[in-house]
């Protein structure tokens, strides 16, 4: 199972969930992926799109000795999973999207928390004496301490011993813009043969509009290989807000047709 983070995340975000997943489902292994221009996957050639990120997964599978049987993606990573499913026709594949709507989000991206974080990063220096100095600068600029500490996972040590923010923010903007405009509903409307898809929605999140929720429910009613799960107490960060509830879904017995 591939585990994919969201924008400005890293593969480490899903380490705890992945470990518990393979403990509960020992026939599976887990691969924590740094998506392009995140973590250790820096400097890949463009274009920087959801489709390119999905192609990276196909290339990753080609480099492994074992086949990939599934993928889970949060937020941006969820749309990467949906795009990746286009290449999975006739292959047994278990796919999970975590609070990731198939809809384009359009102009609303400019008011999102992620866009505000990027604006903050762009206004700050590129180098800091330490991780603590970076966190302090982010907090002083108005970001919550938890967000600043999470972003610090992207820091890299320079040859001079300083810290610099690893991802190229221009590339990150390209990825966000493509994600914001991507419409993945056709994947759900004609789910590739051999694939199952579970969509997990945070009950306190606004990522899925009321019409989105209604539409995925209708699709699930028509296709037994699509399931929708609402975790009422979770916000967008489902794996943080309700880790146990998410694990219960990921490790629940599959129905015969799945």
Give the label of every model feature segment.
Residues 2-6, 201:
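The conserved beta1-alpha1 loop
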Residues 6-9, 75:
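Active-site glycine-rich loops that stabilize anionic/oxyanionic intermediates
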Residues 8, 35-39, 102, 235-238:
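Alpha/beta-hydrolase active-site loop signature
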Residues 15-18, 22-76, 86, 248:
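Active-site loop/oxyanion-hole signature of alpha/beta-hydrolase fold enzymes
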Residues 82-86, 90-129, 134:
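Flexible "cap/lid" loop of the alpha/beta hydrolase fold
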Residues 126-178:
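Conserved alpha/beta-hydrolase catalytic His-Asp/Glu region
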Residues 160-221, 227-230:
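Conserved serine/cysteine hydrolase catalytic core
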Residues 231-247:
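Catalytic histidine-centered segment of alpha/beta-hydrolase-like enzymes
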């Amino acid at each position: 199972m591939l585990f994919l983070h969201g924008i400005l995340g890293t593969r480490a975000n899903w380490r705890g969930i992945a470990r518990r997943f393979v403990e509960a489902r020992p026939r599976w292994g887990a691969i924590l992926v740094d998506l392009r221009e995140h973590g250790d996957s820096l400097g890949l050639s463009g274009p920087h799109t959801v489709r390119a990120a999905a192609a990276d997964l196909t290339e990753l599978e080609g480099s492994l000795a074992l086949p990939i049987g599934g993928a889970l993606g949060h937020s941006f990573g969820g749309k990467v999973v949906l795009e990746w499913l286009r290449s999975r026709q006739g292959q047994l594949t278990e796919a999970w999207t975590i609070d990731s709507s198939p809809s384009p989000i359009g102009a609303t991206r400019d008011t999102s928390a992620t866009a505000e974080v990027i604006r903050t990063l762009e206004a700050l220096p590129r180098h800091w004496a330490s991780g603590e100095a970076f966190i302090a600068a982010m907090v002083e600029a108005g970001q919550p301490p938890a967000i600043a500490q999470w972003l610090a996972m992207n820091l890299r040590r320079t040859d001079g011993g300083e810290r610099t923010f690893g991802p190229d923010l221009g590339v990150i903007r390209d990825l966000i813009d493509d994600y914001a405009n991507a419409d993945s509903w056709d994947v759900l409307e004609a789910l590739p043969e051999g694939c199952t898809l579970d969509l997990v929605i945070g009950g306190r999140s606004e990522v899925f509009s009321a019409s989105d929720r209604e539409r995925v429910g209708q699709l699930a009613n028509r296709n037994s290989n699509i399931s929708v799960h609402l975790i009422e107490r979770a916000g967008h960060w489902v794996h943080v807000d309700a880790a146990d509830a998410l694990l219960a879904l990921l490790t629940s017995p599959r129905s015969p047709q799945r």
